[in-house]
Amino acid sequence: MKIKAQIGMVMNLDKCIGCHTCSVTCKNTWTNRSGAEYMYFNNVETKPGIGYPKQWEDQDKYKGGWTLKKGKLELKSGSKTNRLAGLFYNPNQPSIDDYYEPWNYDYETLTNSPQKKHQPVARPKSSLTGDFMNIEWGPNWEDDLAGGHITGLEDPNVQKMEESIKTEFDDVFMMYLPRICEHCINPACVSSCPSGAMYKREEDGIVLVDQNACRSWRYCVSSCPYKKVYFNWQTNKAEKCTLCFPRLEAGLPTICSETCVGRIRYLGVMLYDADKVEEAASVENEKDLYHSQLDVFLDPNDPEVAKLAKEQGIPAEWIEAAQQSPIYKMIIDWKIALPLHPEYRTLPMVWYIPPLSPIMNLFEGKGSRQTAEDIFPAIDQMRIPIDYLAQLLTAGDTDHIRSTLKKMSVMRQYMRAVQTNKSIDPELISSVGLTEQQIEDMYRLLAIAKYDDRFVIPSSHREEVSDLYAEQGSCGLSFSGGPGSCF
């Protein structure tokens, strides 16, 4: 058993209000510079929709992630020989039109224009070419299902649903999906990089790019199934979400988590067995990948696991943080968090609690007071949102989605009964595999958790480096145009 520690995140989609605060603060922190105008390390998509970049979930087009070939894992982009043969021609990556052409406005026209009969107009100007342009797409073009009746049907998750219910999806529900790099346990981007510039940090599992080693091959861009690796056209280097590692090293949460208005994000440590990773990612049936990844995780409260972890060099503070991890409770204990597209076989480490509110609003009506006994049959009958969430989070297995939504529904019903001094059927609680204490713990963590409850982050264990907290905001990369550069 080879034990490793990994920083992970869980997002509660039931609380996301789609305000894009996380996107704005992330962009102002990391990609507010030349060459990175089109990059959003964090973006919020409205689903159903084709997302950013367009149709990023269509791996037949982009060849991202892993596939099984004769029982062995192989990159969907092909073998090493195939990638070497096409080293100077990689057609499977998004173009700027798939992201969007960034623009600004010619505000000088407004301030410097002489008196005219007609009001001057600030026309959009491309940030790439400097020419005037027509705006045809943007990173949140589909916000709140804008144009969803057109682009929504092109969503790969919708296309996998039954033909008879495709055309009705936009009348059923919508949801927000915040996305960052998944910092996968089995990252395809790391394995595909010809120059070895992509790497996964040993101490915390964060996936980063060695800017000095990057040679602009861009196989990381196409091989990432979540399309969260970008190419900086100014520096000719790959860039991606860093999980704000300078903040994590100082024991602080990521900037997207810190500024989240809905408080949907949770950060914590997970221990996993590195020897089981290949086996977990190689299961034949895609619907078994969720359970196989659960088997990779280790119980930090097990004395034997804690002892072995300490012997293998994991600091005591990290083991203690893993024992108090909020994401361990949601992923392992309560099983209400699910991985995004586990069928990509990358074993992602940003998990999601599926949203119950769209389904409840449809069935109950806003402000209604239906009981869990009434809602359970409705959850079973609502094929469209259940099927869609299953394509998104469980490789098409609807049983896990139904189980999670029923747990969330029982939690709502139980806490409503507690608040109004009413009783609730104990069999209803036991039917979802939870106890009253677990439901109360779920409520505290999901609804009223304090800052220190949501973010359990051990500081870095580098005794011989300088003060990381004091150095935040100072020089990062040494070349001009790099993130955090002083030049």
UniProtKB/Swiss-Prot annotation:
One of its GO terms (biological process) is nitrate assimilation. It is a peripheral membrane protein. Its main location: membrane. It is an enzyme of class 1 (oxidoreductase). Keywords: 3Fe-4S, 4Fe-4S, Cell membrane, Electron transport, Iron, Iron-sulfur, Membrane, Metal-binding, Nitrate assimilation, Oxidoreductase, Repeat, Transport. NCBIfam families: narH. It comes from the Bacteria. [4Fe-4S] cluster 1 binds at C16, C19, C22, C260. [4Fe-4S] cluster 3 binds at C181, C184, C189, C224. GO terms for cellular component: membrane; nitrate reductase complex; plasma membrane. Its EC number is 1.7.5.1. Binds 3 [4Fe-4S] clusters per subunit. Gene3D superfamilies: 3.30.70.20, nitrate reductase domain like (1.10.3650.10). It comes from Bacillus subtilis (strain 168). It is found in: Cell membrane. Coiled coil: none annotated. [4Fe-4S] cluster 2 binds at C26, C241, C244, C256. [3Fe-4S] cluster binds at C193, C214, C220. Its cofactor is [4Fe-4S] cluster; [3Fe-4S] cluster. It catalyses: nitrate + a quinol = a quinone + nitrite + H2O. This is Nitrate reductase beta chain. Residues 7-36, 172-203, 205-234 form the 4Fe-4S ferredoxin-type domain.
